[in-house]
A protein has these predicted regions:
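Short S/T/G/P-rich N-terminal loop/turn motif that feeds into the first structured element of a domain
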Residues: 1-52, 56-70, 77-96
């Protein structure tokens, strides 16, 4: 399995997570369609938020990154959102 973590802070991050929360059903539908989807978390922080996507392989997490980028461009272009810090890697242990 492969995990990608996107950390949003700075300009527009809080507003972005307000919109993501308002439209969480749409976000869920989009992410569940990712090839090899395993799990997803949308986490609010004091200065924005974090998303954690787990897929069967790197191809799935790459697809999720592209879909997230496209969704943000299409739905929150009016907010000046700083690009996320992206961390990714292969899972050593996954519990559910």
């Amino acid at each position: 399995m492969h995990t990608v973590i996107r950390s949003y802070s700075g300009s527009g991050a809080t507003a972005l997570f307000d919109i993501l929360e308002e439209r969480k059903e749409e976000v869920e539908s989009l992410i569940r369609a990712v090839t090899g989807f395993v799990s997803y978390s949308l986490v609010r922080t004091t200065d924005g938020g974090v998303t954690v996507t787990v897929c069967q392989d790197k191809a799935g997490t790459d697809e999720s990154l592209q879909l997230a980028r496209e969704w943000i461009q299409a739905n929150v272009a009016n907010i000046d959102v700083s690009p996320p810090a992206v961390t990714e890697g292969s899972n050593i242990l996954y519990l559910s």
